[in-house]
Amino acid sequence: MTTDVTHVTAGVTTFFQGEHQSHPLFRIEPGIPCQDAREQASELMGYVRELTIVGLMDEKPMMIWASHYLSAMAKALMDDAELGMRG
């Protein structure tokens, strides 16, 4: 599969802003092909799904929190890829 490198991440989306969403701790890197970013987001969401199920079924809240943070990463990847695809 060929990757369209004309559309790349913008590098402006932050995630996990810390207490009260006031401190950007992580940012998506600019210049990543949007297709790659979207594929990685999909992979992360698969992990989110599995961790959520394990956390609920086994009553392990740490798994739920892990899935929460991974979903924030996946959302940031998708949001930044969307910005990159818009131009």
What residue ranges belong to the model's regions?
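Sequence/structural signature of long amphipathic alpha-helices
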Residues: 1-87
